[in-house]
Amino acid sequence: MTELERLIEEYCSNGVEYKTLGELGTFYGGLSGKSKDDFVDGNAKFITYMNVFSNIELNLDTKDTVQIGENEKQNTIEYGDVLFTGSSETPDECGMSSVLTKHTEEKLYLNSFCFGFRFYDKELILPGFSKYLFRSEALRKQIKKT
């Protein structure tokens, strides 16, 4: 019996209910339909691939901007969202995550090389915890398998 199995048996006598992320929230894509020119003198902040890759929680002190039209439909990042890198040069670097752990009034947009996940229930997992959960070795191991 593994340590995990022992703990489940001891503390969860009725077992543990497993759910997929798809049952707990929804995935969304980053920016779409943008050209190189849209990233010159933009009017809105966007979160770069390297911001997601390099930080367990988003660095909001960024000067990266993108041009967003008044009626343009793009996904925005919300408090508690978990962001993932979609691809990388090596399998070990795929699926790196970062979490928006601070409330902000400013609209934030995600680069097109990443995707986001938003929990249906914003109180299910604290962002301060999910930033560690989604960067944990156990979860990273699962991502590398796929």
Task: Go through each PLM region and give its residues.
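Conserved secondary-structure micro-motifs at functional edges
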Residues: 41-43
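A short beta-sheet element
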Residues: 48, 70-135
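Non-catalytic DNA-recognition/assembly elements of restriction-modification systems
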Residues: 3, 7-31
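Sequence-specific dsDNA recognition surfaces
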Residues: 22-35, 50-82
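A cross-kingdom feature marking solvent-exposed beta-strand/loop segments within repeated
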Residues: 1-11, 57-71, 94, 100-102, ...
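Basic, amphipathic alpha-helical recognition segments used for DNA target recognition
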Residues: 20-28, 38, 53-54, 58-59, ...
